[in-house]
Amino acid sequence: LGVNNFASIVTNTSNKAVLIDGKKLKSVNQYYNKKKAKVQSQLKKTNGKANSRRLMNLTRKRNNKVKDYLHKASKEIVGMCLEDNITTLIVGHNDGWKQEVNMSKRNNQNFVSIPFDMFISMLRYKSERQGLRFVEVNESHTSKCSSFDLESVEYHDTYVGKRIKRGLFRTKDGILLNADVNGSYNIMRKVKGDAVMPPYTGFGYNPVKKFINKYTLK
């Protein structure tokens, strides 16, 4: 789970990698944060009830947009599982998410504004309702370890692969794949082991992008 790529999805039943676009949701949060700061600044100057109501309405509208996006994204993912005859849905979870990482203020703001725990709860409910097994696993070390090199998913002083520019991950043998796809395979390996890894055919370099409608807060 992330911001620009809201969810990265891989399976052990097909050579298919899917990224659910998160930029529309990100833009909703950016617009909300910008307008919220403006209204709060006006409130400090005037203490007016009208501005207070504006802030409440803005927040309600933003929350409704976010919740609607999460519902549609979770429905899309569970639908993909059923379509591909997946019986277990594995989701990576970071206890502190990514706020503890040294990121820009804007990125931190985006992470704080996206209720990933709510999204995971929606996924759990919808998947179990369809008879799927739902597993939540800590995603620590999954972004640094090389999935296609079958590197053990744990801390290493030196890693065999490396994340490089433009969100790409390079394996020990120089194979390039999307960094989020690499992390997703490692999340799956934490639960299912190395046997789930498919032969690499280049699909991880250019995964399929899915969009959850067009969102705007304006």
Model-identified regions with their sequence ranges:
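Well-ordered beta-strand positions
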Residues: 1-2, 170
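Positively charged, low-complexity nucleic-acid-binding target-recognition regions
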Residues: 108-218
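Substrate-contacting helices/loops that form the catalytic groove of nucleic-acid
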Residues: 2-120, 197-218
